[in-house]
């Protein structure tokens, strides 16, 4: 219990496990609140299988506004970019940027999620569980070796109903990372299992799950499993969700969501039951002992490429089984998007013609398609007005209202609500102050001069600038930082004293009372 807030962790954690363990980039367990924390801890695991979370391994509390930038690699049974196994009521505004690679060298069933690997792993007292405004941009993959099966989702690996958990919602979450695995793969959720048996008895509690406003633009690649293992060798993947198994009374409701990611079969061999759905791979409804489950898919669009070599391939749902299933408002006949293996993005009109020399909005992101029909990526370029500069990121998405690291120029910039680059501007986010210099680069990691050529400031490692009063310059001399980050020069006062600061570099010279 308790709270952990506003902390950053760096480093590398190498684990040679001899037994099952829980490992977190920040904490093993959380029963309180983890908020505004960052992990840059790389986790490498060998030996026995373990459960890993980029922030926390086991969570029964609240996790908010946390970011994981560390990579996770090794022999891992459950791996989540933020949480390994979740039983908490709220996970919100979390971001995973770290890559996850699982070595599935045996017959185990692995669970991998960009945000949460296993959601619903505890008998919860709460009746509602919410995952809100979370994003994964890390690439998730399993190695080719071994006979294991993977449940991999861009946001959630496996969503299960257990105990008294009655309502779960995943709202406004998105995955832009690429997913590659053998087994079940879904752009948002890999596997939904509601009505799970415990000690051979059906869970009696009715349960509902809602997915609303979620989006996948990551490329999904399905690999066939080794025929010598205990699992079927088929490839199973869906743009939003993979497979489902629902037997308890209640409703699964997936709505207002979309996929623009491409779905590919790896290699040239096609299995008899390979199944791909642009929205979902398979819906299975299994009424049990008088239960009445319902499954609705509403207003969900697939705009991405679907590999038609699969035995069962659909723009919407690859396969379904059972009653009380409705798919409505999901027909789509507009622009289509295809991402090549090297990340090159193409867009096509409904008639198959390439889109060129044009900005295009896919419902979530804006792209610019060049004369050769490929999307501009990692490029600072002029807006059509010829005045403002915009940025298309490594996924081809125009950036709005956000700080963004631009690999092509090697620095972090800020883009406003219209996508325009900030240059020579001081900006405020919460209690933090930032300065974007004349080139648009965020000042960080040391002293800098403002574009006016006169004033100095100090940028911290995280890009915030000192704006909190008294401090020191590089020579150990006392200086004063104004609210806007500029080092004070000349005469300043706090109402009780006047302070004389050097007119050139701002170092402290002396003081005298205001009353003199």
Question: Model-derived features: where do they sit?
Answer:
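Surface-exposed loop/turn motifs in large extracellular/passenger domains
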Residues: 1-334, 341, 386-388, 454-455
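Extracellular adhesion/carbohydrate-binding repeat motifs centered on closely spaced tryptophans
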Residues: 334-516
């Amino acid at each position: 219990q308790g709270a952990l807030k506003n902390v950053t962790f760096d480093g590398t954690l190498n684990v040679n496990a001899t037994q099952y363990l829980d490992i977190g980039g920040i904490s093993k367990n959380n029963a309180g609140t983890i908020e505004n924390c960052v992990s840059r801890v790389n986790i490498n695991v060998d030996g026995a299988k373990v459960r890993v979370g980029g922030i926390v391994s086991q969570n029964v509390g609240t996790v908010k506004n946390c970011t994981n930038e560390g990579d996770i690699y090794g022999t891992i049974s459950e791996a989540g970019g933020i949480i390994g196994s979740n039983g908490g009521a709220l996970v919100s505004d979390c971001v995973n940027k770290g890559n996850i690679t699982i070595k599935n060298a045996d017959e185990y069933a692995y669970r991998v999620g960009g945000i949460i690997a296993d959601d619903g792993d505890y008998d919860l007292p709460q009746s509602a569980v919410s995952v809100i405004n979370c994003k994964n941009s890390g690439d998730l993959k399993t190695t080719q070796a071994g006979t294991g099966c993977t449940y991999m989702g861009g946001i959630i690996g496996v969503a299960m109903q257990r105990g008294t958990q009655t309502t779960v919602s995943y709202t406004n979450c998105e995955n832009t990372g690429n997913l590659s695995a053998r087994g079940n793969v879904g752009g948002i959720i890999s596997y939904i299992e509601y009505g799970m048996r415990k000690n051979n008895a059906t869970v009696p509690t009715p349960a509902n799950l809602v997915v609303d406003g979620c989006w996948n633009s990551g490329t999904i690649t399905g690999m066939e499993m080794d025929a010598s293992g205990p699992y079927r060798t088929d490839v199973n993947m869906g743009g939003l969700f993979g497979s489902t198994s629902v037997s308890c009374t209640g409703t699964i409701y997936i709505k207002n969501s979309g996929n623009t990611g491409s779905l590919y079969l790896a290699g040239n061999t096609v299995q008899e039951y390979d199944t791909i759905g642009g929205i979902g791979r398979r819906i299975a409804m299994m009424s049990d002992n008088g239960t009445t489950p319902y499954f609705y898919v509403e207003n969900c669009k697939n705009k991405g490429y679907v590999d038609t070599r699969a035995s069962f391939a659909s723009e919407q749902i690859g396969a379904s089984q059972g009653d009380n299933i409705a798919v409505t408002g999901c027909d789509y006949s507009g622009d289509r998007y295809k991402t090549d293996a090297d990340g090159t993005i193409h867009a096509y009109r409904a008639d198959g013609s390439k889109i060129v020399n044009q900005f295009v909005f896919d419902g979530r992101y804006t792209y610019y398609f060049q004369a050769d029909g490929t999307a501009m990526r990692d490029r600072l370029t002029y807006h059509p007005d010829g005045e403002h500069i915009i940025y298309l990121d490594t996924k081809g998405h125009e950036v709005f209202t956000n700080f963004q690291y631009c690999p092509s120029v090697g620095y972090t910039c800020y883009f406003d609500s219209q996508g325009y680059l900030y240059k020579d501007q001081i900006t405020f986010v919460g209690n933090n102050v930032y300065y974007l210099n004349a080139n648009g680069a965020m000042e960080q990691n040391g002293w800098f001069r403002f574009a006016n050529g006169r004033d100095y400031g100090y940028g911290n490692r995280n890009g915030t600038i000192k704006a909190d009063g008294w401090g020191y310059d590089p020579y150990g001399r006392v200086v004063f930082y104004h609210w806007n980050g500029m080092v004070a020069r000349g005469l300043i006062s706090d109402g009780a004293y006047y302070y004389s600061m050097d007119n050139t570099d701002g170092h402290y010279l002396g003081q005298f009372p205001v009353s003199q």
